[in-house]
């Protein structure tokens, strides 16, 4: 029996967290390549530490990329523009170690095969309007509001920050927020009282639904006391270190592959996006209230070696019918995924902070629910509804 009454916790980090800085630089490189060369192959990793950025990877493209300029522009947009913050876009060194993609990989990918082996997961549930788990969606809401408040005038806030939200479930449904943790980098000069008041009033109160907050909700702000040293000075940043933040906050499973810095021929990214697209349409169609999809690939082979659908006992029709409907409605080869979701556009830098899923921007094509009717028909749900209405 699944747990019915429990607490579930998810975390998010701001765009100024060093690992997210690395993700955004890697995806800025990918976008720069796709603008000039949609057929370019990109596997870009970034590392940041005090005073420098290192960009490394395998990139095969006709595009001409100014890597140092791109890195500095990204860091500047994030907000690190002074040595007082521990990192300065204007003075940081940028090291570049980029080679071409191995021809051994290229011979399989160029003919439409998967760029690597592996399994990828997609997940959706009906806990929020975005069909995302409540804990991760609320954690992202806090970090987004933290960045918004910083840019709106709370000049003692710095770009680095994290949130953590614990949601109480009863009978399997989210009913209240039990604990909120916010850790934000700040200027040395600000008092704890001023900081705590600002975060409570300008961040938490604006980010989270009032109906889920009560007198018993614990609010913890910078629990260690102070957070002056942050960003790459406080922690080394590396691409691909926040894969649970990027996805479902631990509520859905993860195949292990990171997203940022990878062009869509890499199924680590594109098939995970397709998994989300499928799961979201299953839930939107009313076929289930929770859905997880697993797809798996072999390198150089176009069709997935397996497709699995798990609805955790919430399906309105047999899961086998849903799985067959998925294969009927969705193209699952890398080429079909890329074409179906229009993934050769330079849209990836925006995905690299505040989650790849549960977003409302139109560029996030994998968040559409335009296949729900076709899926319901293919799974036989429309016939069941028609009979029930007679």
Swiss-Prot record:
Binding annotation for Mg(2+): 19
Annotated localization: Cytoplasm
Source organism per UniProt: Anaeromyxobacter dehalogenans (strain 2CP-1 / ATCC BAA-258)
Subunit architecture: Homotetramer; dimer of dimers.
Biological or metabolic pathway of the protein: Amino-acid biosynthesis; S-adenosyl-L-methionine biosynthesis; S-adenosyl-L-methionine from L-methionine: step 1/1
Binding site for L-methionine: 58, 101, 235, 266
GO biological process: one-carbon metabolic process; S-adenosylmethionine biosynthetic process
Record NCBIfam families: metK
Top-level division of the source organism's lineage: Bacteria
Protein name per UniProt: S-adenosylmethionine synthase
Record's GO cellular component terms: cytoplasm
Binding site for K(+): 45
Segments of this protein annotated with the region Flexible loop: 101-111
Keywords for this protein: ATP-binding, Cytoplasm, Magnesium, Metal-binding, Nucleotide-binding, One-carbon metabolism, Potassium, Transferase
Free-text cofactor note: Binds 2 divalent ions per subunit.
Coiled coil: none
EC code(s) of this entry: 2.5.1.6
Pfam families: S-AdoMet_synt_C (PF02773), S-AdoMet_synt_M (PF02772), S-AdoMet_synt_N (PF00438)
Chief location: cytoplasm
Reactions the enzyme catalyzes: L-methionine + ATP + H2O = S-adenosyl-L-methionine + phosphate + diphosphate
Family from the record: Belongs to the AdoMet synthase family.
Keyword check for Magnesium: yes
Function as written in the Swiss-Prot or TrEMBL entry: Catalyzes the formation of S-adenosylmethionine (AdoMet) from methionine and ATP. The overall synthetic reaction is composed of two sequential steps, AdoMet formation and the subsequent tripolyphosphate hydrolysis which occurs prior to release of AdoMet from the enzyme.
Binding site residues for ATP: 17, 160-162, 226-227, 235, 241-242, 258, 262
Cofactors demanded by this protein: Mg(2+); K(+)
KW Kinase (keyword) present: no
């Amino acid at each position: 029996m699944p747990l019915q009454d429990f607490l579930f916790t998810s975390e998010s980090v701001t765009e100024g967290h060093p690992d997210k800085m690395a993700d955004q630089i890697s995806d800025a490189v990918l976008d720069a390549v796709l603008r000039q060369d949609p057929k370019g192959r990109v596997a870009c990793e970034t590392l940041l530490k005090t005073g420098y950025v290192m960009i490394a990877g395998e990139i095969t493209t006709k595009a001409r990329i100014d890597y140092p300029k791109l890195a500095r522009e990204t860091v500047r947009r994030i907000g690190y523009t002074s040595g007082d913050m521990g990192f300065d876009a204007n003075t940081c060194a940028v090291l570049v170690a980029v080679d071409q993609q191995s021809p051994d990989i290229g011979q399989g990918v160029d003919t439409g095969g998967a760029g690597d082996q592996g399994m990828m997961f997609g997940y959706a549930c009906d806990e929020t309007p975005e069909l995302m788990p409540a804990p991760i969606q609320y954690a992202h809401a806090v970090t987004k509001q933290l960045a918004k408040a910083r840019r709106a005038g709370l000049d003692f806030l710095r770009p680095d920050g994290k949130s953590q939200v614990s949601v109480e479930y009863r009978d399997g449904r989210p009913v209240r927020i039990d604990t909120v943790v916010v850790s934000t980098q700040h200027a040395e000069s600000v008092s704890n009282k001023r900081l705590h008041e600002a975060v409570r009033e300008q961040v938490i109160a604006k980010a989270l639904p009032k109906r889920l907050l009560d007198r018993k909700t614990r609010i913890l702000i910078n629990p260690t006391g102070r957070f002056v040293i942050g960003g790459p000075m406080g922690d080394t940043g590396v691409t691909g270190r926040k894969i649970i933040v990027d996805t479902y906050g631990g509520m859905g499973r993860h195949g292990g592959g990171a997203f940022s810095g990878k062009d869509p021929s890499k199924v680590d990214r594109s098939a995970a996006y397709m998994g989300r697209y499928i799961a979201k349409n299953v839930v939107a169609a009313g076929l289930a209230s929770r859905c997880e999809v697993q797809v798996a690939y072999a390198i150089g082979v176009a069709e997935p070696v397996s497709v699995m659908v798990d609805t955790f006992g919430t399906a309105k029709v047999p899961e086998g019918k849903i799985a067959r409907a998925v294969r009927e409605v969705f193209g699952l080869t890398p080429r079909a995924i890329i074409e179906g979701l229009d993934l050769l556009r330079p849209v990836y830098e925006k995905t690299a902070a505040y989650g790849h899923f549960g977003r409302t921007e139109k560029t996030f094509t994998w968040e559409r629910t335009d296949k729900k009717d076709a899926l319901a028909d293919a799974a036989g749900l429309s016939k069941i509804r028609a009979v029930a209405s007679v």
